[in-house]
Amino acid sequence: MVQHLTAEEIIQYISDAKKSTPIKVYLNGNFEGITYPESFKVFGSEQSKVIFCEADDWKPFYETYGSQFEDIEIEMDRRNSAIPLKDLTNTNARIEPGAFIREQAIIEDGAVVMMGATINIGAVVGEGTMIDMNATLGGRATTGKNVHVGAGAVLAGVIEPPSASPVIIEDDVLIGANAVILEGVRVGKGAIVAAGAIVTQDVPAGTVVAGTPAKVIKQASEVQDTKKEIVAALRKLND
């Protein structure tokens, strides 16, 4: 199983990161004689521009040239952000629109991350693992191979306090919709966590747990194969 950043390394990374407030500015007006800072990315025509820049760089620019603008619309979706979204260019996985995956998360080959899922810094999505809609992998939460994390499920993150142990999900585990796995819990290979369960302690390999708090109710071997099947076709990428 892939191991990634320690809590201390993540804390240092966030502390040292240059905080960013990127904005997108739509402008109509007279742009004659305007000089744009090198940090600006400018697109458009003679009478209309779209500018990508930092909020701190926009302020002095606007103070200088604002009288030349007729219409202004500014989009801002974060403030003093320390962690950008992950560059997925070289990620060999299926990532659907609306998934939020932060830098320093690991997405292994053949994984699937569905709409609305959130993968925080330091989290690991194992090979062939599916993170279903609106599920959350908190900081440093780690899944093995061929895991299914159901819609709305939460694997608790542990960056603060840094002494806490991360959630570890071993290979071939099924986690039902809206289940919650608390920090420090390890779910053993081939286990099944029922929908809505709240897991507060380690789950033995090959067992089924359910309830609040979750308790072992039977063995995974007693569950019909069709109810615990991992479908390879859903993880298939282009040939």
From Swiss-Prot:
Quote the HAMAP family the UniProt record gives.
DapH
Per the record, the gene is dapH
Source species: Staphylococcus aureus (strain bovine RF122 / ET3-1)
> What EC identifiers does the entry list?
2.3.1.89
What's an example Gene Ontology biological process for this entry?
Answer: diaminopimelate biosynthetic process
Q: Which family does it belong to?
A: Belongs to the transferase hexapeptide repeat family. DapH subfamily.
Q: Which GO terms describe its molecular function?
A: tetrahydrodipicolinate N-acetyltransferase activity
Stored Gene3D superfamilies: Hexapeptide repeat proteins, Malonyl-CoA ACP transacylase, ACP-binding
The protein in question is named 2,3,4,5-tetrahydropyridine-2,6-dicarboxylate N-acetyltransferase
